């Protein structure tokens, strides 16, 4: 039996949960209520639901497919401009939230801590945002001429209205002469960040490595290999840890040709298929592209 003093604490905490839920709209509050509970001794379960898809527009600690692509895989590539394509909120909340350290001059040749968004409004939902996206990419290339490419990170509304970001990517890539990578990472696609990792890996395969293969056929890929070439994959340089790994590898006479995404560049990604070995730090987020290279 729960002592009276503990029962009072339990009731206080239940009231606190009610107070938190009162700030939500009625429909959202009903859904969030299932995820909040007070621990009571002797209960047969934890009292909360889990493994449920993130809801578009509702902040969660778990993240979504967009977070897995933009926040983890693509965002740390420092010399590319990463556009959060959709309403301003997703890009704002994912902006500079991770300590992906990098070397470079922000706004000149590196853009990792900058926030770029197409800032979707109601009219864009009605009429589509393709033209707006084309104009945005063109303007960004004028404003930041030292960028080495662009990634388009789709937010939920883009998938719902069916914008053709692939056509935009092909068109603008020809215009600016740089890689433009469309990533269908709308948040509603995955229960967590995990599917976003997979989608992002697939886009590296389809839009970056194909470019590398073509350059190799054309004889324009400038790469002189050695037997000691390696790539560090899936290290996001959180707090600078990739730099420490790189120093250790170079001390044993390995040549680190590429490291990504942390402090990584699009050119390093293009060179990666030529190395002798991939060294994976975060298996969960980068095993897909590593398996592709192993099997190719």
Swiss-Prot record:
Enzyme class: oxidoreductase
Keywords, in A-Z order: ATP-binding, Iron, Iron-sulfur, Metal-binding, Molybdenum, Nitrogen fixation, Nucleotide-binding, Oxidoreductase
Pfam families xrefs: Oxidored_nitro
GO molecular-function term, one example from the UniProt record: metal ion binding
Residues holding [7Fe-Mo-9S-C-homocitryl] cluster: 282
Enzymatic reactions: N2 + 8 reduced [2Fe-2S]-[ferredoxin] + 16 ATP + 16 H2O = H2 + 8 oxidized [2Fe-2S]-[ferredoxin] + 2 NH4(+) + 16 ADP + 16 phosphate + 6 H(+)
Claim: Ribosomal protein is one of the keywords in the record: no
This enzyme's EC code(s): 1.18.6.1
Top-level taxon of origin: Bacteria
Binding residues annotated for [8Fe-7S] cluster, in chain numbering: 64, 90, 156
Iron listed as a keyword: yes
InterPro entries: Nase/OxRdtase_comp1 (IPR000510), Nase_comp1_asu (IPR010143), Nase_comp1_CS (IPR000318)
Cofactor(s) it depends on: [8Fe-7S] cluster; [7Fe-Mo-9S-C-homocitryl] cluster
UniProt remark on cofactor binding: Binds 1 [8Fe-7S] cluster per heterodimer.
A Gene Ontology BP annotation from the UniProt entry: nitrogen fixation
Disulfide bonds: none
Stated role: This molybdenum-iron protein is part of the nitrogenase complex that catalyzes the key enzymatic reactions in nitrogen fixation.
Oligomer status and interactors: Tetramer of two alpha and two beta chains. Forms complex with the iron protein (nitrogenase component 2).
Family per record: Belongs to the NifD/NifK/NifE/NifN family.
Protein name as it appears in the record: Nitrogenase molybdenum-iron protein alpha chain
Taxonomic lineage from the root: Bacteria, Bacillati, Cyanobacteriota, Cyanophyceae, Nostocales
Gene coding for it: nifD
């Amino acid at each position: 039996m729960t002592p009276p003093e503990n029962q009072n604490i339990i009731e206080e905490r239940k009231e606190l949960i009610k107070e938190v839920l009162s700030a939500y709209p009625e429909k959202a509050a009903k859904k969030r209520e299932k995820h909040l509970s007070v621990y009571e001794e002797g209960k047969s379960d934890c009292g909360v639901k889990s493994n449920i898809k993130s809801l578009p527009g509702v902040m969660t600690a778990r993240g979504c497919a967009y977070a897995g692509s933009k926040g983890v895989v693509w965002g740390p590539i420092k010399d590319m401009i990463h556009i959060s394509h959709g309403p301003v909120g997703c890009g704002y909340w994912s902006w500079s939230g991770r300590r992906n350290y990098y070397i470079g001059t922000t706004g000149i040749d590196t853009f990792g801590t900058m926030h770029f968004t197409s800032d979707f409004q109601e009219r864009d939902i009605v009429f589509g945002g393709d033209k707006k996206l084309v104009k945005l990419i063109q303007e960004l290339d004028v404003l930041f001429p030292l960028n080495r490419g662009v990634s388009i990170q789709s937010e939920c509304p883009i998938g719902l209205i069916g914008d053709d970001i692939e056509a935009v990517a092909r068109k603008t890539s020809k215009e600016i002469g740089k890689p433009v990578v469309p990533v269908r990472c709308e948040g509603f696609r995955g229960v967590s960040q995990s599917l976003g990792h997979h989608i992002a890996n697939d886009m590296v395969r389809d839009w970056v490595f194909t470019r590398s293969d073509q350059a190799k056929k054309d004889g324009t890929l400038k790469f002189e290999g050695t037997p000691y070439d390696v790539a560090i994959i899936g290290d996001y340089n959180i707090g600078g840890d990739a730099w420490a790994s790189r120093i250790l590898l170079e001390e044993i006479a390995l040549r680190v040709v590429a490291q990504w995404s942390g402090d990584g560049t699009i050119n390093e990604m293009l060179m990666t298929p030529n190395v002798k070995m991939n060294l994976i730090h975060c298996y969960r987020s980068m095993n897909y592209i590593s398996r592709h290279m192993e099997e190719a």
